[in-house]
Amino acid sequence: MSLVESPPWQALKSKYQELSSLHMRDFFAQDKKRGTRLSLEAAGLYFDYSKNRVDEKTIDLLCESANACNLPLRIEQLFSGKLTNESGEMVGFHTALRQVNNFSFKTNNNAIQEIHASWEKIKKLSIRIREGDYKGFTNKSITDIVNIGIGGSSLGPQMAYNALKPYVKAPLRCHFISNLDDTDFYETVRTLNPETTLFIITSKTFTTKETLENERRATEWLMQAAKKENLIQTHFMAVTAAPEKAHEFGIQKDNIFMLWPWVGGRFSVWSAAGLSLAIAIGWEEFFEFLRGAHAMDTHFRQAEFNKNMPILLALLSIWYINFFHAKTQAIIPYSQRLVYLPDYLTQLHMESLGKSVQLDGSAVHWQTGAVVWGDLGTNSQHSFHQLFLQGTMVIPVDFIAVLKNSRESHWQLPLIANCLGQSQTLMEGYDKEGVMRDLINQGIEHEKAEKLATYRLIRGNNPSNTIILEELNPYSLGSLLALYEHKVYVQSVIWNINPFDQWGVERGKHLAKDILQALQAETDQSSFDSSTERLINYVLKIKGNRP
């Protein structure tokens, strides 16, 4: 029986017909404790999902759908290393990277031992660099760490580093290079000193074009200062699942950190792919980061579905995507330190859930995924919230609020007020009675107020979740990221798709190689479609006129 044929799914269709014409204002008017009932705390996070177009029966039916998809079994498979891809290879075992309290796995003991060894290696290097004992080619201590990677190898560490900057030990600084455009590289290193700069090359296969090209630029940049290749070897570290290729590329064996094949790039910040972060904030704080994620893992495994934060977050997304036909979802963090979080979550969602084939190879017959995007509040309020408030689409929003930036900082009351104000306005709207009252109180005549009111109405009934962190620290950040990882995994289980591959991306890389050869006038262009062939010829024409 397919997902859409299951009894809970059919019941959800009827429930959608019932609720689609109702307004959330009425839910709150009829239930004064709705905000209390539809909220929970776990792993250092507070989650309010009361401003959603659901009642308790909806939640029950969504949970029944999850059970019908064998979610309990699939959760245990995630934590036991029993998930495999179409080739039978283990995937999605990133949760093992943060099992900080105990290692009660019945299988994969070798993986656990390797993780422990990796922790020790990360810890030792972090201590050496932070204490100034790791030297460059002129015997000066390292002050700047440049992470070269792309996708999850860059987005995760950069997002976490920016979020945890108050925990970075001066004078250490981290920088992140990912783009093939050489501007990214040269603008980053422009103010750096080659004598005190360490490059961390992160590539699972060590064949990624963008990463290896930037590594070549780094080598050239260092050689201009050091003159001799043997002097710059201490300025490179590698994080990879292909250590032999990294060594062939010139990275010393002792400077190679393991990234296992069963860790996807977008789930890799917990591994040595987070080496730059571990160095910057120190091993103790990095371990807190892992501990926060582990706390959310424990909650995810143990809590009942209707009290389970990741599961509820996922089921609400399913509700809007598959029944309200939402095509997009927004993430709005109200903290400058979370500026890169929307980009990170965009990749996590869209690369994991952008699939049209089920696990058995058959076609998907229901919508999967959505465009996930966002920006910082309050910037976003003056940019695109207008679409949320008076547009015609259903766009679910996750608001993320931080009460205090750190133990020493003041409460972020103005930010919090804006965050909560947006969520309330999205829910209740601004009806004609309220608009007219406010306009008349401003001294506007009734006839003119009638004309103006039409343009100021806000229908409301737009869904949102609010997630609150008491303080943005390594523990709470780890918990927040794990929350969204598990949310995405639950969605993949219900849609019966593989969240751990990205073959569409791989195909694009392959075609880029063919097109590059054509642009270098080395191959026949007849294999390309007429549009691509014409574009190639246009580039060659301009290239011929401009050396």
Curated annotation (Swiss-Prot):
The active site is at E351 (proton donor), H382, K509. Catalyzes the reversible isomerization of glucose-6-phosphate to fructose-6-phosphate. Its EC number is 5.3.1.9. This is Glucose-6-phosphate isomerase. The gene is pgi. The keyword Nucleotide-binding does not apply. Its main location: cytoplasm. It catalyses: alpha-D-glucose 6-phosphate = beta-D-fructose 6-phosphate.
